[in-house]
Amino acid sequence: MSVGFIGAGQLAYALARGFTAAGILSAHKIIASSPEMNLPTVSALRKMGVNLTRSNKETVKHSDVLFLAVKPHIIPFILDEIGADVQARHIVVSCAAGVTISSVEKKLMAFQPAPKVIRCMTNTPVVVQEGATVYATGTHALVEDGQLLEQLMSSVGFCTEVEEDLIDAVTGLSGSGPAYAFMALDALADGGVKMGLPRRLAIQLGAQALLGAAKMLLDSEQHPCQLKDNVCSPGGATIHALHFLESGGFRSLLINAVEASCIRTRELQSMADQEKISPAALKKTLLDRVKLESPTVSTLTPSSPGKLLTRSLALGGKKD
């Protein structure tokens, strides 16, 4: 079995490194394509011994399981490019947030009647074999195809099959989850530094606390609240800290973060499906939108091309 990645960014690197570290694939059985060969992830893949190419078609030709590891809005253009090269042996795995099985199948069915498509959502901890992955199989994918993907992804962490309509929510929870954890760790380390700990020690202690807590939960059948209560002694430091978190809306912030990620996932698919614009045009549209929405807009004045004119928007006529 050979595995191909269209896209050689963080996800492709994390999966390739995870697969090779787990021993389920050797590097020479992996190929990745990217139009840009100077990316840090491309350099890292090259050092691992992964085959690299600028040609997406070449990646399809030399793979059996094909991961679409690019941004959602690029998927339609990739499928138009490689559709004629996808054969009956290929299992096409879309890892792009919000991209539905039906949208991939519709594109590929212009080239062949029964493309085998699987939608997958994973996360970057696959790089250390601690990923969280769910997948849903398409109309023409066989049971064996799903089992093959599950075998691959289980080698780099937890993997299970779900109904496709759950995957957007999974994206908001575990797909984006590592970023929430890293932000929390950064804040915890800042707290430790504020109270006198060296930065390196503060980071290590915070990371180990989260790692240990996660392992305790996964190894037990107890509810997180019960494990939390076990840490709190009456009138102690921990319950006072938790009261402070509650008063700051800690739970609501996390719930809202999961919801925001899920909603954005659906927006990304809508942008690709409805606007039908090229990746370059989409990038320009987003940049223009950022400029319009930014509270500070910088432009070059016609009379002074070398000078920067900054217009600050004041709220209610007041200045900060």
From Swiss-Prot:
Biased composition range(s): Low complexity: 295-305
Pathway: Amino-acid biosynthesis; L-proline biosynthesis; L-proline from L-glutamate 5-semialdehyde: step 1/1
Modified positions (Phosphoserine) in chain numbering: 304
Regulation of its function: Subject to competitive inhibition by NADP. Was reported not to be inhibited by proline. However other study demonstrated an inhibition by proline.
Signal peptide: none
InterPro entries xrefs: 6-PGluconate_DH-like_C_sf, NAD(P)-bd_dom_sf, P5C_Rdtase_cat_N, P5CR-like_CS, P5CR_dimer, Pyrroline-COOH_reductase
Catalytic activity: L-proline + NADP(+) = (S)-1-pyrroline-5-carboxylate + NADPH + 2 H(+); L-proline + NAD(+) = (S)-1-pyrroline-5-carboxylate + NADH + 2 H(+)
Cross-referenced Gene3D superfamilies: NAD(P)-binding Rossmann-like Domain (3.40.50.720), ProC C-terminal domain-like (1.10.3730.10)
Oligomeric and partner information: Homodecamer; composed of 5 homodimers. Interacts with LTO1.
Pathological association: Leukodystrophy, hypomyelinating, 10: An autosomal recessive neurologic disorder characterized by postnatal microcephaly, severely delayed psychomotor development, hypomyelination, and reduced cerebral white-matter volume.
Family per record: Belongs to the pyrroline-5-carboxylate reductase family.
The name this protein goes by in its record: Pyrroline-5-carboxylate reductase 2
Organism of this sequence: Homo sapiens
Gene: PYCR2
